[in-house]
Amino acid sequence: MAQLLLIYNGMFSLNKYCFEKETVKMKNVKVILWGLGAMGGGIGKMLTKKKGVDIVGAIDIGDKIGKSLYDVVPGIVRGDREDVIVGTPEEVIKPGAADIVVVCTNSFTKDVYDKLVFVMEKGMNVITSAEEMAYPQAQEPELAKKLDEIAKKNGESVMGTGINPGLIMDLLVILWTAACEEVNHVTSRRVNSLSPFGPAVMEEQGIGISVEEFNERKANGTMAGHVGFAESTMMICDALGWKWDDFGQDMEPIVTDVDRKSPYGFAAAGQVAGVAMKGWVNIDGERKIDMDHPQQIEPEQVGVHTGDYVILDSVPPVNMVNTPEIEGGIGTMAMIMNCIPHCINAAPGLKTMIDIPVPHAIMGDFRDLIDEDKKIVK
């Protein structure tokens, strides 16, 4: 009996050794950051706190080029990591340089398209914070088709995600419908703060402009407001099998009566501090989806309480309330970081949040979530 136990223990130790040896064969997940603003830099800080993942490249513009990543991103900790020097796309994006590139530079598919193509043609997966890329077929079907073709040709995957679109007003709604036999109407409401977001978002939302300028930009189509209603509603419709045909949206300025200052924006009393957006979808003449999304800098300063709400006229009915809101800045960074393994593992092509497994926090080793045959940097 003692001999059998010794043999068993020896086999167990050998198997344990072999298993551990096998698991350490895979190199850390290699990531390149393209764009080191509030979102890209924040994702970098998050990644340095995780196991099994390395930042191996960084891209930006202006005076950041030639400097250390750990000098240009506030609060990021280098520790004993190798230094990463910020460079140009041509200097950093090389074949086989990384498993995935995180692009945080633009909101619109047409503006980020060339960057995504450049990455894929160098043989790497790419994930972006560009809001329209959460479901680009909604407003840029031709570009979406081209991205899918280029990704498949190069054997890589491309996707966009974030807190919204990407989770709160689309994927979360879709997940709740899984408990329903029938769904008659969807209401999604998000009251959130814009304070964590960077200069690009401040510009898109018109923070600090006059009401007159807001109305002028709205009239000539240069006032972006929230980017994502078309993407979120089409994602919901496609998931549920509804025909997305009659879509509309509107916006009104949120005018502050006190001075408000966020890390990247300022609105004096009488100026625009945010945008109240509404969106809707009618199917066969019947309203099926309503979106309500007021967002502004420093809402708490004027007594506005943030929150996320999903209301389904369904069987059974659903009424989800989360207060305060899931914070948009951290939420967007985390969504992108936590989708990195899914993007790497995905079959080649353009992917969306309804094409990949449900994302989740990664508290262990990134390498444990990567399919070995999908790893680029072996």
Which stretches of residues belong to each language-model region?
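N-terminal glycine-/serine-/threonine-rich beta1-alpha1-beta2 phosphate-ribose binding loop
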Residues: 3-122, 342
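ADP-ribose/adenylate-binding Rossmann-like module
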Residues: 116-140
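Short, ordered loop/turn segments at secondary-structure junctions
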Residues: 61, 106, 124, 130-134, ...
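A short helix->loop->beta-strand "cap" motif at the edges of active sites that frequently abuts
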Residues: 122-124, 153-156
